[in-house]
């Protein structure tokens, strides 16, 4: 039973990372493919299309990394501030903190006597850990790493973004838009199904949802490209 529980905990962590990776790759695919399609629809030559796509890849990856770094850093700062405050309160008012932990367990369904016993034993073993986990909701096993999160976010975005760029290099010059659109939609369907499967949702529904928005984004940028291409 303990082996199953241990496996389930690690599976939850892996699913979280998988979903984040899929979302990053989706962002890279949709944004870069849409940019490539829009520039190609404007009648630009292959070198111009590739330069625009590569610039979009770099800008998007850096933006994702910066956003993830700021987000995770802010979360980490908030958690550390909460833990520091809890440490001070445990030092200054230990009885009040024990009462607070007891009320927390009573609210979860334990009777007051048992809740007091649990709170007392956990406090004797690791008071800060008990309060961090059960009062603040900060799991002991989950630690946010801003730099790691930023690198993963940038890398997954770049992996998705490089797909339409490769197709733009290999496709016939006159059919770059078509080849990029078809390849991107197929890749989005696969990623959408993978993300849905990781989250326990229906694979077909997840694939169609992502594919629809990808198609809409590329259609919108193609329309803009054609409009400005005609005007020019």
Describe the predicted segments one by one.
Residues 1-20, 72-154:
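Cytosol/matrix-facing amphipathic helices and coiled-coil assembly/linker segments
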Residues 1-71:
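Internal alpha-helical transmembrane segments
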Residues 13-24, 46-54, 114, 146-151, ...:
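The feature identifies polytopic integral membrane transport proteins across all domains of life
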Residues 28-33, 153-163:
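Core segments of transmembrane alpha-helices
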Residues 174-187:
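Structural signature of hydrophobic alpha-helical transmembrane segments
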Residues 190-215:
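Interfacial loop-to-transmembrane junctions
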Residues 222-232:
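Juxtamembrane boundary at the C-terminal end of a transmembrane helix
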